[in-house]
Amino acid sequence: MNTSRLFSLLFQGGLVKRIAAGLVLGIVVALISAPLQETIGFNLAEKVGVLGTIFVKALRAVAPILIFFLVMAALANRKIGTKSNMKEIIVLYLLGTFLAAFVAVIAGFAFPTEVVLAAKEDSSSAPQAVGQVLLTLILNVVDDPLNAIFKANFIGVLAWSIGLGLALRHASDATKNVLSDFAEGVSKIVHVIISFAPFGVFGLVAETLSDKGLVALGGYVQLLAVLIGTMLFTAFVVNPILVYWKIRRNPYPLVWTCVRESGVTAFFTRSSAANIPVNIELAKRLNLDEETYSVSIPLGANINMAGAAITITILTLAAVHTLGLEVSFVSALLLSIVAALCACGASGVAGGSLLLIPLACSLFGISDDVAAQMIGVGFIIGILQDSTETALNSSTDVLFTAAVCMEEERKNAA
């Protein structure tokens, strides 16, 4: 397939095919940018990279407003006494995170990995204690609503939208209709933004590969193999088992749909928060209950941290093995779970799980200097690690929501 044919695919066909075309074109541009730089006088990959920057910026800009109006409208229009599926979804989120940590601990001990610690990185923004992380979480909940939207504090946005939605359940029908119209209007804007995903992926891939390349990953092949292998095992073995537990039929068609439609986009945006609009659009196409997914998907972007659990656990155990420390399997599992649950404070941020490595390392008695260097390792492999982690986190949000909604449909049909 020639390049002109690939360019034409950016404008026609289904979204997935167009994204695939953008991916291939991004790789091509990244490969030819360096040889062409002397001829054309500039780095082509850096120039087209602005497309990716604009796409991610647009997604992140619309996400807080989308969550605010969608959740508020869904709760305000919800009939009093209607059964909610949120409890089951939250259980799946937490269970999925627990099992991801469990699988990561097994992988960490089965394939012990040592790394050459990179140059010391600044870790001043990393949380120092569990209490501090929890305090930050509480302060985010009670943040000023306008400030929460302005700074994309999704926990604060979610808290205020839930509070206002519940308070407006007794409002007049006219008020509820206005909220629904606002939510619908923002959803249409999201649909337009998502239609530009192929161009965003094209820019992101071209700039990322041109800037960092794959050569820098050579020294961390085993660590990457353990990390990505564990995430793939969670996505295609652990998660399908949980989904089958709910829907009682072959889970893989649903799993593959979520990975293809949500995971691919999340892989390139590297932000669960930026992928919220994509997940909501997918949930709508799957005909899921809007009152459920409008709350569960934004919530999942903050608390469904299977990928973060794996990253924190594997990198911390790599530090343990590098230093030659002896840690029991049970201690490693428990401490990693604590760190993964606290990762809620860093969710929705590209590379956010890396900030929790000092927390996990401190629980093992590892010094801040070593922990900071492990963050450096995380940034080096982040081109693949962070992308895969976000794809797992975000696709699981819509996967578990769909599983619970389908379970409810199955029960109602019985």
From Swiss-Prot:
Transmembrane helix recorded as keyword: yes
Alphabetical GO biological process terms: serine transport; threonine transport
Transmembrane segments: 22-42, 54-74, 89-109, 148-168, 189-209, 223-243, 305-325, 337-357
Compartments it resides in: Cell inner membrane
Function: Involved in the import of serine and threonine into the cell, with the concomitant import of sodium (symport system).
Family the UniProt entry places it in: Belongs to the dicarboxylate/amino acid:cation symporter (DAACS) (TC 2.A.23) family.
Protein name in the entry: Serine/threonine transporter SstT
Taxonomic source organism: Haemophilus influenzae (strain ATCC 51907 / DSM 11121 / KW20 / Rd)
Organism placement in taxonomy: Bacteria, Pseudomonadati, Pseudomonadota, Gammaproteobacteria, Pasteurellales
Gene encoding the protein: sstT
